[in-house]
């Protein structure tokens, strides 16, 4: 990990393949220029005084500074993970390859089982580098909302719509980012659905989701 580019960022959100009890993340640095910056960003700008000290507690236990990255100041914050979260992550890291293999296998089986449904278009990737964090389908003929509504009301399955383009949010529109012209993004977002696909789901639950989607699509 971390060999692509100078800095690699990993999310450990609860819905990711590897999690740290809800929230968390990791930064991996592959460039010595940034090694001292990351710890400062993580913990409120804490750093050493940069001088030899006869007494380790004087003038204080630690210094504070604003991290600099390529000549630009970056305001730090408290992004530290707790000990329990780190302990869990350390154990899950040993299993993440197995988890990814399981996710890929489930995703390919799911996609292939619905391949005859012309209303649904999946992005099927055979590469072992694709971990299927999300299982997403694009729905044709404007049937997306009808499918989501029927799955939720009749089967208790809540699909999601992810992720709202930033330029559609009123907040970003209010600060001048609402004029973006992204027709492909709009087309995809307005016709996509994200299928429940957490690693914690059992094989039976995954099969129920798949069969329910088939029933709904074939009824349209």
Name the predicted role of every residue range.
Residues 2, 10-11, 25-30, 60:
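Short beta-strand-to-turn element immediately C-terminal to the catalytic PLP-Schiff-base lysine
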Residues 16, 25, 42-45:
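Short, well-ordered alpha-helical segments in soluble proteins
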Residues 22-23, 84:
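A conserved catalytic-core signature of glycosyltransferases
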